[in-house]
Amino acid sequence: LEEKTMSTVRVQPLVTTQWAADHLNDPNIRFVEVDVDTTQYATGHIPGAVAFNWQTQLQDQVARDIISQEDLEKLLSENGISNDTQIVLYGDNNNWFAAYALWLLQYYGHDNVSLIDGGRKKWLAENRETTTDTPSYPATSYKVSKINHDLRSDRDTIKKRLNDPNFALVDVRSPAEYVGDIIAPPGMSETAQRAGHIPGAKNIPWGQAVAEDGTFKSVDELKALYGGKGVTADKEEVVAYCRIGERSSHTWFVLKYLLGYNNVRNYDGSWTEWGNLVGSPIKKGPEA
């Protein structure tokens, strides 16, 4: 799981629960829990882990956008995270929002970031140590040094490439959302004026990439899953989208890190943007 270089040890983007347990006391690592249900952390979490709230801390609170550079610097500084800290993320719901946080951190240039395979579910299933103590760490002065714009897509880029054979779109929502029977999963508040999908998108629900225990499926299974729909490594660009950008971060992680696709982007505007756009092309019904 580690690549030893001359002076540092580079941690792989995906680590096991055992690796995490072995590194609980490593001062260069900060464990961060990011849950869909933000009350989960208080019921028990990995010792030493801090929590990020996806609703209030990872999104702009006024504009429809990701957290600003300044707010991210403040969040990381307050949690004692420096530019060279290895951030190890995990969460509930098979790492939905942990993957979103990883995408966001990489977008803002923090490369030393990993995901615990299986997330919170696997950690608890293995009866590993938890605590209800909330740790505090000495503040740092975190500074973003670069922004990786090539990890993010937007509506205008997608519109221009809709008929491009070298471009692949993956809609990772449920089949019911894809065909246009429903606009959002039951109980979710963010919806859209229109239901359906972006023309040409292939429907590969995010959950098809994970096994029963919440870990990712094998590389061979994943290759068959995406390759079977024509979402292959030889595409010039692959873009994943969902409803608000969190489920698609999960698929983005699979394509980029587990399958090694060169150019994968997350369209975080996703259906809550596209389904509300005046004049945007939409399709309903099953894949052509």
What are these regions (language model features)?
Residues 169-225:
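A mid-sequence, solvent-exposed acidic-amphipathic segment
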Residues 43, 125, 276:
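Phosphate-coordinating loops and pocket residues in cytosolic domains that bind phosphorylated ligands
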Residues 2-39, 120-193, 282, 287-288:
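Flexible, polar/low-complexity N-terminal or interdomain linker segments that lie immediately upstream
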Residues 66-167, 181-182, 196, 243, ...:
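Thiolate-centered catalytic microenvironments shared by cysteine-dependent enzyme domains
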Residues 262-288:
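Cysteine-dependent PTP/DSP-like catalytic domain, specifically the C-terminal lobe
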Residues 41-48, 102:
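Glycine-rich loop at the start of a catalytic domain that most often binds anionic cofactors/ligands
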Residues 56-87, 202-237:
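Helix-loop module immediately N-terminal to the HCX5R catalytic loop
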